[in-house]
Amino acid sequence: MTPAPRADIRHHDHIVLLVDTFYGKVRNDDLLGAIFNGIIGDRWPEHLEKMHRFWGTVLINEGSYTGTPLRPHLDMPIGAAHFGRWLQLFHATVDELFEGPVAQLAHRNADRMADMFQERIERYRTRPQDFIQ
């Protein structure tokens, strides 16, 4: 029996499923869980709602996110291993739930965002006086 094809990411319910499933994995991850849970604490509902808006804006043009996503991450105790694990979990979640052009866009955007965050966090740590978000 052939498995049913997965849908592409098309509407807000898909964004909620992606974000909630992904962050469920992050919260329970041996490497990432303590960091995220320690910083977010009991504010997970608010964080998830913000991530729904962020990924909804990035992937399906909802236009509901405003903010600067890099700023909250600058002082987090994270490095290459953390970004690598974040990407593993994100890509696995996308692939478990979806397939299609927007799912591929999610992969590309996550890769670009992780690369940019790592580069800017490193610049901020080594030369904060020169840092421009």
Name each model feature, range by range.
Residues 1-133:
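Core of compact, soluble alpha-helical bundle domains
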